[in-house]
Amino acid sequence: MRHKIKGRKLNVTSSHRQAMLANMAVALISHEQIKTTLPKAKELRSYIETLITKAKKADLAVRRSVLSKIKDKKAVEKLINILGTRYKDRPGGYTRIIKAGFRYGDLAPIAYIEFIDRDVNAKGNIKQDVNEDTKN
């Protein structure tokens, strides 16, 4: 029985899973929309939403905590400065998952995961996003 067991194994080791979620979180923060398999998207949703909830507080302890998870300074800057302020009044539900059919090779279910109220022009240039936000 699976009582009180949270998360998905995704058929990888725990260190692989941790690194994969961190890398996918950086990609989602930079591009604001990524395409992946449905189970990975569902797992990433809970991972990224806890990071955004922490980032709304925006102090040094939160910055260090988030940096220990995703290990990318530019992504942490965007997470705290842009996404944290964008979702300041939203109590949760920062992402949406859109099902996109099945992959050709193995029929794995594919989905897009994106931020609610995302910037459509965000194409992965984190430095430009952070600089534009600090100019205002």
Curated annotation (Swiss-Prot):
Coiled-coil stretches noted in the UniProt entry, renumbered to this chain: none
- Which InterPro entries does the record associate with it? Ribosomal_bL17, Ribosomal_bL17_CS, Ribosomal_bL17_sf
Report if keyword Transmembrane helix is assigned: no
Please indicate which superkingdom the organism of origin belongs to: Bacteria
Question: What SUPFAM superfamilies does the record tag this protein with?
Answer: Prokaryotic ribosomal protein L17 (SSF64263)
Mind naming one GO cellular-component term on file for this protein? cytosolic large ribosomal subunit
Alphabetized, the UniProt keywords read: Ribonucleoprotein, Ribosomal protein
One Gene Ontology BP term is: translation
Q: Which GO terms describe its molecular function?
A: structural constituent of ribosome
Q: What is annotated about its quaternary structure and interactions?
A: Part of the 50S ribosomal subunit. Contacts protein L32.
UniProt-listed PANTHER family: LARGE RIBOSOMAL SUBUNIT PROTEIN BL17M, RIBOSOMAL PROTEIN L17
Hey, which family's this protein in? Belongs to the bacterial ribosomal protein bL17 family.
Q: What is this protein called?
A: Large ribosomal subunit protein bL17
Q: What are the top taxonomic ranks of the organism? A: Bacteria, Pseudomonadati, Pseudomonadota, Alphaproteobacteria, Rickettsiales
